[in-house]
Structures are given as structure tokens and as C-alpha cells.
Amino acid sequence: MVAPHLWLRAETKPLEERSALTPRTAKILADAGFQITIERSSQRAFKDKEFERLGFPMVPEGSWRHAPKDAYIIGLKELPENDNSPLKHTHIQFAHCYKNQEGWREVLSRFPAGNGLLYDLEFLQDDNGRRVAAFGYHAGFAGSAISCLVWAHQLLHPNKQFPAIRPFPNEKSLVRHVARQVRLALKKNNNQYPRILVIGALGRCGTGACDLASKIGIPFDNILRWDINETKKGGPFTEITESDIFVNCIYLSMPIPKFCTVESLNVPNRKLRVVCDVSCDTTNPNNPIPIYNVNTTFDHPTVEVKGVTTPPPLEVISIDHLPTLLPRESSEAFSEALIPSLLALKDVDNAPVWVRAKKLYETMVQKL
């Protein structure tokens, strides 16, 4: 049996510092007989020298296009923009084209056009239907952190745009920074901590959002933990307007009643200042938070909700790669969880996780 060849491509999405493989997990695979090739990257949280030190061959950024046909091209976010050329390789990545997202046909059609194959990381599942690896915890953690920073900024710097934000070296430094800003803002809020409503609180993402809130000192009773039992009555929910911060952590798999609308938020005595849509189903027609229509970025983290004229200010965070706020820790956790599935590439035609992923790809291609 020929050892699988994994080719780690450099991410090209602006400010994306995460990596599908880390030096540690790449070595685990190499020790198991895999051939590993690493593209150089100026923005990856793990420096080139960390891979070089372990003896991995390094190749120029973007050279995956010329990789051997049998190499698996592994990455995280979308391929470079403004390129619709056919794809001849097998790609392992988050493609965001299986849930009717805007432009999904253009993204997906590149794979069959070049006789390539897509294994979408979002849909790698175990025998129980649970994702084998996900960034959910760190997405919720980061979304909650930025939400608290935006809340504090509104109180400390009224009428000033929330500034660009950059990744933190580790969780400890992020928690320390957010806690300090919230403490400063308390003086402008009658020493009252914000009330945070987390919907999807029982999942990995929601757990991360609640953990951040707890770690920065927000009292337990100020963190409303909602899940399916609380939302099954159907929205819009007045509890959202009565909270200072709303963090949406659900996994959207079917149409559901709206959690909130511009109309439901445009009411007197609204407390809500910040909405973080961690789920970020911006272009999904079933988005339960239809109060914005653009993805925000680390350079411009928030967007105002148009049509809401009552005070206080209301901003949405809709960054679609929140875990890169903690790129090293989130990458290590994700990559470690992915290792058993990657090891199964040695028997890719029979390993259930890959057989299911290929079948799903073929089903989606039939819809083109």
C-alpha cells in the first residue's frame, strides 16, 4: 500500500492564521508513514521554521496546483479568489457549498470539472453522525470575547467605530484583555455586568461562548443558556431585546422561525447592543437572524443594523473564521481531533468516514 501524501496548502484568506496541520500533528502522520509536504506561509500562526525543524520538505505558497495528482490537498478555508479553474486533486477543506450558500454552484462545479474530489471537513462524521473535528468551541469562545469587547467599547467610546482586532497568542492573554475592558466599562454601566444570551448553549460552540463569559468574571445568573427546549416555542424572542449581548451558536440544518427581526428589535427600552452570529449563515435563506447581510472581518469586525432607530446602538459581528482569534490553540485542538480520520486515509476506499464524505460529495454534484 502506497503511503498517502498530504500537502498542506497555505491559507490565502486575509488574516487566517489557523492551520489544518500543526508541526505536532504533521509529525504524528509522518511517523505513521505518511508523506507530508508543507507550503510556506507568511501568515500561518506556526512559523515555517517550526516545520523545517522537524525535517518536512517546504515548497512555495500556492504550489499545490502542481502537486502530484495523488496528493491530498489539505487546508481550511476557501481556495484563492478569482480562480474558477478546474480542480484535479482531492481536496480536504471547508468549502461552504453544501447548504445553498451564495455561489455554491460555482465553488462545487470546479471539482467535477477537473475530475477532482472534495472531502468537506464540515461533513466528516463518525458512525453516530457526529462531526469528527470542529472548531466550534473556539468559535464560540472567540465570538463571545469579541462581543464583550464591542459592548465595552460602546460604553467607553460612544459613537466611535469598533477598531480592527488581531489574533491573540493564547487564551490567557485574550481573557485578560477582555476582562480588563469589561471592568472598565462597568463604571459606565452602574457597575452592572452585561446579560448574555447564548442560543445553542449545550453544543461545543455554545459551551465555548459560556466559558469565555465565566472566565472574564460575568456572574452565572447573567449568562442565559438556551438550547432547543427554550427555542422550540418559536421566535422572535423578547428575551433577546432584554439582553445586552446575544450570541447565536446553533447549527442550522433546516428552516426554523426567526430568532429576531429588525421589527422585533426596533422597540423602546431595548437593552441589546451586540449580536454575534457565530453560526454565520449570512447568505443562507433560512438564516434565523435576518438583520444583516454581510460578513464582517477582523479589520472591520462589526456592522450596524439598518432600520433599527431606537437607542442604544446595535451592532452585529458576523466574522466567518472566528477561531483564528486563537489560531494556535484552535488549530492544535482541531488537528488533533482530525488525526484518526487522516490516519484512515490509508484505507480511504473502505474507511466509513471517507466513504460517507465521498458519497455526500457525489450526491451534491448531482444537484449541479
UniProtKB/Swiss-Prot annotation:
Pathway: Amino-acid biosynthesis; L-lysine biosynthesis via AAA pathway; L-lysine from L-alpha-aminoadipate (fungal route): step 3/3
Domain of life: Eukaryota
EC number(s) on file: 1.5.1.7
Protein's UniProt keywords contain Amino-acid biosynthesis: yes
Lyase is among the record's keywords: no
Enzyme class: oxidoreductase
Catalytic activity: L-saccharopine + NAD(+) + H2O = L-lysine + 2-oxoglutarate + NADH + H(+)
Residue(s) carrying Phosphoserine: 85
Signal peptide residue numbers: none
Record: residues binding L-saccharopine: 18, 77, 101, 131, 135, 279-281
Residues the record marks as active site: 77, 96
MF terms in GO: saccharopine dehydrogenase (NAD+, L-lysine-forming) activity; saccharopine dehydrogenase activity
GO biological process: lysine biosynthetic process via aminoadipic acid
Covalent S-S links between cysteines: 205-249
Pfam families: AlaDh_PNT_N
Alphabetical list of InterPro entries matching this protein: AASS, AlaDH/PNT_N, AlaDH/PNT_NAD(H)-bd, Lys1, NAD(P)-bd_dom_sf
Annotated keywords: Amino-acid biosynthesis, Disulfide bond, Lysine biosynthesis, NAD, Oxidoreductase, Phosphoprotein
Binding site for NAD(+): 130, 203-204, 227, 231, 251, 278, 319-322
GO cellular component terms, semicolon-separated: cytoplasm
Function: Catalyzes the NAD(+)-dependent cleavage of saccharopine to L-lysine and 2-oxoglutarate, the final step in the alpha-aminoadipate (AAA) pathway for lysin biosynthesis.
Family according to the record: Belongs to the AlaDH/PNT family.
Protein name: Saccharopine dehydrogenase [NAD(+), L-lysine-forming]
Organism, scientific name: Schizosaccharomyces pombe (strain 972 / ATCC 24843) (Fission yeast)
